[in-house]
Amino acid sequence: LGCGTGTMTEKLADYGYDMIGVDNSEDMLELAMEKRMESGKDILYLLQDMREFELYGTVRAIVSVCDSVNYITEPEELEEVFRLVNNYLDPKGVFLFDFNTVYKYKEVMGDTVIAEDRGECSFIWDNFYYEEEQINEYDLTLFIQEDGSEDLYRRYQETHYQRGYTLEEMKELVERSGLVFEAAYDAVTHEEPTEKSERIYIVAREFGK
């Protein structure tokens, strides 16, 4: 879910899994399908909003990484995403996802500016954190080098909104959706999350619909 340009989808396909990628960005899926053509993998991509996604049947596992769920800024809508996940999982199927925490947006990223020069691509990342709503707005300005030119860069601008969640909030949403909450891990230490965990992995499971 939220497969983006298909990088993780391709990696999982490398391990022999049959993959379906779901994303609501045509541009992202276009890049994903270019990667599919290069690799020759049999991956099905679907242009769908994860809040309303539909599959042709149930699957053994659903994965959502790279803070895709943080783009769902209303808890009620995220609960509905989890209900759909539960609906499309095989009996006792597993759901793996990650999310950025309130701590990360408030204490690490909030109201900061990040700038980086990577040669062919440079960016300025300007963050604004709204504490009451737990929402982080970031304005991203990209400078991407044009093919065949050393001096010409094209500028692109994007604005994104992501909501931070606490582990307690996320656990409640998972359980209210009908899924069974199994485990949580700090994304860096792979141990039990702490108050200062910035990204958390969640393992949940279908257990009867």
Outline where the language-model segments fall.
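Class I SAM-dependent methyltransferase "Motif I" SAM/SAH-binding loop
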Residues: 2-4
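Class I SAM-dependent methyltransferase SAM/SAH-binding core
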Residues: 7-52
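A short acidic, Gly/Pro-enriched loop at the edge of an enzyme's catalytic core
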Residues: 54-61
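Residues lining the SAM
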Residues: 65-67
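A short His-aromatic
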Residues: 70-72
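A short glycine-rich, Lys/Arg-flanked "PGG" loop and its adjoining helix->strand segment in the class I
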Residues: 79-91
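SAM-dependent methyltransferase
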Residues: 96-171
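C-terminal lobe and adjacent flexible extensions of AdoMet/dcAdoMet transferase-like proteins
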Residues: 161-209
